[in-house]
C-alpha cells in the first residue's frame, strides 16, 4: 500500500471531466479525491465538479470552464470559471482558503493539485501534473489523482500553445460531476 492509498474500508469520492478540444470531444478524466488526507480541499473540488454549491440559485463550478495554461512535461492548469484567464478565484469557503497540508508530494504524472498565487490563496484553479514536479512540494496541495483518462490529459498537454502557455485551441470541461 502506498501512502496515498485510502485506509481500509474507506471509499473516496470519484469525479470526472468530459473534455473537448476545439469542438471535438477528447475523452473523460476520472479523478479520485483524497478526502481522508485533504478533506477541505477535496470537498471544494468535488462541489465545484457537481455544481451543488450555488449563489442565487446558480450552480458554481467547472462545467464549461477551460484549461487556460498548458506546459508540456510539467502540467495542465484550469478551473478559472470566474475570469477564464488564470486571475479568477472562488471557493465554496469564500474567495480563497488556506493550504490544508502538503502530505502528498508531486512525484509523477496524474496528480491533482491546487494552483495558487502564494501561501493560503487556494480557490478554484487546479492543475494536473504530466511529470514529476518536486519543486512544487510544500507550496501546492496535492488532493487527488487521475485514475482513468491520463491519455486525455496527454491530449491536453499536446495542444499547441501561444503567449502565456495558453492553448491555441480551446480546451473545455464540457461536462463534469461525481461518479
Swiss-Prot record:
Q: What name has this protein been given in UniProt? A: Peptidyl-prolyl cis-trans isomerase H
Q: Which GO terms describe its cellular component?
A: cytoplasm; intracellular membrane-bounded organelle; nucleus
Q: Which SUPFAM superfamilies match?
A: Cyclophilin-like
Q: Name one GO biological process term.
A: protein folding
Q: Where in the cell is it found?
A: Nucleus
What keyword terms does UniProt attach to this protein? Isomerase, Nucleus, Rotamase
**Could you tell me which InterPro entries the record lists for this protein?**
Cyclophilin-like_dom_sf, Cyclophilin-type_PPIase, Cyclophilin-type_PPIase_CS, Cyclophilin-type_PPIase_dom
Under CDD domains, the record lists:
cyclophilin_ABH_like (cd01926)
Instruction: Describe the reaction catalysed, as an equation.
Output: [protein]-peptidylproline (omega=180) = [protein]-peptidylproline (omega=0)
Report the sequence similarity comment from the record: Belongs to the cyclophilin-type PPIase family. PPIase H subfamily.
Cited PANTHER family: PEPTIDYL-PROLYL CIS-TRANS ISOMERASE (PTHR11071), PEPTIDYL-PROLYL CIS-TRANS ISOMERASE D-RELATED (PTHR11071:SF561)
* Domain PPIase cyclophilin-type span(s) in chain numbering: 16-178
Q: Which residues form a coiled coil?
A: none
* Protein EC: 5.2.1.8
Q: Which domain of life is it from?
A: Eukaryota
> Does the keyword field hold Nucleotide-binding?
no
Principal localisation: nucleus
Q: Which organism is it from?
A: Cryptococcus neoformans var. neoformans serotype D (strain JEC21 / ATCC MYA-565) (Filobasidiella neoformans)
Presence of the UniProt keyword 4Fe-4S in the record: no
Q: What does the UniProt record say this protein does?
A: PPIases accelerate the folding of proteins. It catalyzes the cis-trans isomerization of proline imidic peptide bonds in oligopeptides.
Amino acid at each position: 500500500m502506498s501512502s496515498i492509498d485510502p485506509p481500509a474500508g474507506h471509499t473516496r469520492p470519484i469525479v470526472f471531466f468530459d473534455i473537448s478540444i476545439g469542438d471535438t470531444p477528447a475523452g473523460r478524466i476520472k479523478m479520485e479525491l483524497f478526502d481522508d488526507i485533504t478533506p477541505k480541499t477535496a470537498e471544494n473540488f468535488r462541489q465545484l465538479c457537481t455544481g451543488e454549491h450555488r449563489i442565487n440559485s446558480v450552480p458554481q463550478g467547472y462545467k464549461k470552464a477551460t484549461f487556460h495554461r498548458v506546459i508540456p512535461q510539467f502540467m495542465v492548469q484550469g478551473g478559472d470559471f470566474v475570469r477564464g484567464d488564470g486571475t479568477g478565484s472562488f471557493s465554496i469557503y469564500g474567495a480563497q482558503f488556506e493550504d490544508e497540508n502538503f502530505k502528498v508530494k508531486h512525484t509523477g504524472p496524474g496528480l491533482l493539485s491546487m494552483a495558487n498565487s502564494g501561501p493560503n490563496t487556494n480557490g478554484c484553479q487546479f492543475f494536473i501534473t504530466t511529470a514529476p514536479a518536486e519543486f512544487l512540494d510544500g507550496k501546492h496541495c496535492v488532493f487527488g489523482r487521475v485514475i482513468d483518462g491520463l491519455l486525455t490529459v496527454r491530449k491536453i498537454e499536446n495542444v499547441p500553445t501561444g503567449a502565456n502557455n495558453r492553448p491555441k485551441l480551446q480546451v473545455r470541461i464540457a461536462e463534469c460531476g461525481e461518479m
